[in-house]
Amino acid sequence: MIKLMNLKFILLGSICWNFPDVGTQCTQYIVDNLSDATRCREKALDVGREQKSKIEELGGFMDDYRAHCMAIDPEGYNVDHSFEISYNIL
């Protein structure tokens, strides 16, 4: 009998924004214990859109947004199901 791996995903992201009077600043974020790759992609898009909206409301613009979904097995090891996400939400 073949046992399927029980994978979880960790979302690692970085966001850079620019305000005319401040310049460019960046931050990183992590969301862990995501149930599957689809949920990780959805969360990455939700975070990107939400942050872009907040930045624009304050008069700035998003310079860069990157996200990476890292698959981990039950022991916490990275496995070959990880992927980078690119969105054109800028």
Task: Kindly give the residue locations of the regions a language model identified.
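Short, mixed-charge low-complexity intrinsically disordered segments
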Residues: 49-90
